[in-house]
Amino acid sequence: EVGIRKPSIYAHFQGKEDLFLQVARYAFQEQNLRIFQYFTERKEQSLEHTLHDFLFWMEQEYESNNSAKFMLRFSFFPPVSLYNEVLNIVNPFLDKMERKLTRRLRNARDREPFAHMEPADMALAYMTLVDGIIVELLYSGSTNYHRRLNAAWPIFWRGITLISSHEGSSGLNCKNIVN
């Protein structure tokens, strides 16, 4: 309850689109703070547990926090008429999260058994994992979310922590494929 009658709400905003974008910005600011708080509270915890538990935390946020639910839904399903404006909110948020995670991975290198990978690549791989699992939450709910999480997490973690003489032995470098 904000105390604004429906006919007068547009006196505070230029229109429905402006109202939507203001709420979207607010939701992203709130979630940015909550995510920062999540990682700050766990800075002494192992990175494996922090990253793994974040996936469960995101599910809990989606189920219990209206800003998180709104943010995730409109990130994946933006209104067609506001597509570019929504991307101008979503992409900087994701870039910021990627930079923070890269920094966290770089700082954890001395304490964690990482493969010889760039922290930026590991951060991007993790964010891709999060995206894929969240899509399942949005489309299918918690049961399929957990099914995907349980299948993908061990493969991801082994991939970034595997240190062996076979590392890179396939000769396949995906960066070269794109170029």
Summary of predicted features, one role per range:
Residues 16, 23, 27-31, 54, ...:
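Hydrophobic/aromatic residues within well-ordered alpha-helical segments
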Residues 29-36, 82-110, 120-124:
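Amphipathic alpha-helical packing segments from all-alpha helical-bundle domains
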Residues 43, 47, 86, 115-119, ...:
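Residue-level recognition of alpha-helical structural elements
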Residues 53-60, 95, 99-107, 127-129, ...:
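C-terminal peripheral helix-coil segments that are non-catalytic and often amphipathic
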Residues 62-85:
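Amphipathic alpha-helical segments used for helix-helix packing
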Residues 22, 36-66, 122-126, 165:
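Hydrophobic alpha-helical connector segments
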Residues 42, 72-79, 137-140:
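Secondary-structure edge/capping motif, primarily at the C-terminal ends of alpha-helices
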Residues 1-18, 22:
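Helix-turn-helix
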